[in-house]
């Protein structure tokens, strides 16, 4: 069919839609096969109208077209089958099995047998793979998410998912233009012609009434159904019958459709698949978004489900797709950060900038002087500055030592945050990279590497094989991959010029790196030693940088040629070809232009003393911003993750911050919080210092209370110290300078925090022994001393739109319809039993024990999937290996540690060294070690592959204290620092050196034994509970006390004869850093959060007041807050 005929079909579709002929619209979409209406397909799929779903699909593909199409039809028919089983319609299920699913038996007979066996089950959820299948609505939603991915990846749907962009009522416009042209040809044109028909050409009637009638003959061929997708020519010979064992080559296969001869990968390599493929289907497999697996029972707890449900709710009011004038809503200039809100002077030329991935107003800046600075752009303050210095000259190469002596000047080339924001990487113009660990407002030296000979041109973080790594490139034409201990994992050779930039990325489960060199070559590498997978020429063939859009779906590059011509392009990944070339650059540039992307919609480039913006879908320049002047010729720029702030360099050695409306709101909110916090702090300090001369420190109280109250106040050391701190410039509490004492906030009243008690949790017989949040953050799981596990879940509703755990809403005590309990085997005398528990990463299974066998429970059905490791000895601690859920470290009652392989039901090795039972286990993937702790107050460090003992260390106990008591261990997010808790102390260890670096001991208001401790989810806080009911919040970097939560704030007043109630265990929410949960000695479980006003621990809120920092809740100084300085151990 000609392109004009095809466009006519689109005009008719638009006309039918505007005239509300909805059924005709979808019928024409199906019959023409030109436009697949994904919204209509979604509506029918979620409504379960399976016949219409398949009928509509049939206009675009058939079951056996390719493996994408096969899996699409399989998922639809499988869902149809499961729904019949779910409503107990066995006859219908058998019919679907025989008529609809039988076709797939020839491709995967084993799967067909497994599906057939579901008929024999009373509830198909008894099948392990279907145990997470929820209700029909949620299952359809998950299915649709999978179908959408398959459709987008299917080459038969290429160019058919987006409706062309043209003006509304275009067909009417063309007809009117035709009529106007016909009217101009009239011999006697009338001023207001009367158009009565379109079947005949228009002609104004002559005066005598005669009319000339001319039939219309449109030069348009009859509409025919398009032919099937014609693949690109298969290169490299016939299809290989033996598929590759791993799908690595498939990720970049599209780029290899016509590779240069230098490509080192055999062209016939494709991903393994259980279905036989014809040679004509090879190129259809060469698409970067292949299905995650072949026909199978999908995960009904998909990560995409939550986002999908949000979108479904927002789309309920308009299910039908419309055909707008543009395929995407026009880009609003208001979405762009164009307004200058601050100008900050750095002092030397700014070379590189990067916003923190979660703290959206924290900007890292690298300079030509080698200096690295963190700026809080909300308050326009420097958080920390690190001048360049060599950390360990002796470890550097002789070449570098000679170079730095000869020419000591050095510049930053790149600063980059790790995806989790815990690490900051810096590369330099001579050999070195530095990696800092970021802690609140502090940068701690973590790793220095002499990485390349000459300049290190770029640095980025990647996560191959679930291991955080640093990727670098340099003038030595090499790309290198390093782990966080400084070990070199890979060296990629193949570029013939200095490597200019790198772009690590992941598509599905394939991880790779794009690299560009100064000769304009683009190469791609997998994390192996095979060599480059791609060899392409970048536009301009000189300095080029590559970036993906925020959602990772679109690839862009920007660069400049040696002649000064600049290029900004979008790539078609599936074909390795240019998709768009953006217009708007001036003729010649005197350097290399820099660019960035944001919101999956906009591109920004610094050129000609301006910032130029493009909409990704339009090659024409969207707008230009001069930022009130003062920009250099080629300014460098960087968006924050939300896209509401933009940093751009200035000509006078500084940078400007530009914001849109959302960005302004973010900055104002930050300023308001900083002002309130500082105002409260200053008010308190002035008042206390005025009283200090006449009041003894021992009786200076924050609030009036009985002497016997558990919330007894902390004395103010002296008025002079308090007054001196009033002169300090206040700053955001989350970025306090650690060299200065933190202020202590006392929370003594229930109005000063939010709390909720889990329903049906109180049990005087069973104490809460272990407590966990689910990894998704929607539930709390408690293991009692009686071996029974209880689960509470928060429901998504208007009061709790996220569905996450919150202290503002009471959760549900969750149990399956069967009424089963998750009860462990318990010995006849359970008093000496040590309960232990571990949860799988996807929240599907929980493993626990309480003096008996270890049981693996299904979290949906509460059924016991298997048991193992019967006593003696009994298990006392459980930990999944972070990289292999089939490997479990099990601490035992006899002081040994068993490394157990679930798959083969075998203990692989036993680790011995402790003298008493094991009380804690923690893995570090960064250091590849396992740390164990025992009731003997000992720590052991083991290698996590050979399981050899590296070192043992006894924790430092107070004089006269016997080495007994549970010792717990937990790794910081950086996988280097280790939190060690014992009833006598909290300690932070540097696990890479196996040395204690900070310690805090109970004292004064917090003098009772410590019962439990945990890092917050971002590892910036440490929560600790005490035997007298107090809860303390510490700054994680230094163990300085930030906040004390008295028992009176979250527990009722005890009666005279009642047993004391206190927290047995404390745990932190996996996504909310200021939310904690405690399990109490009376069996109850509580979730606690700061008040709505303060939002963070350490910001005072008055009891019974709606203002922060007045009287009761205000912060106070405490010697307990500062004792870590005296106990700090030198590194």
From Swiss-Prot:
Region (Disordered): 1099-1131
GO cellular component: nucleus
Domain called CTLH: residue spans: 34-92
One family name in Pfam for this protein: zf_topless
Composition bias, Low complexity: 1116-1131
Keyword annotations from UniProtKB, A to Z: Jasmonic acid signaling pathway, Nucleus, Phosphoprotein, Repeat, Repressor, Transcription, Transcription regulation, WD repeat
Annotated S-S bridges: none
GO terms (BP aspect): primary shoot apical meristem specification; regulation of DNA-templated transcription
Iron-sulfur keyword on record: no
Protein name: Topless-related protein 2
Organism: Arabidopsis thaliana
Gene: TPR2
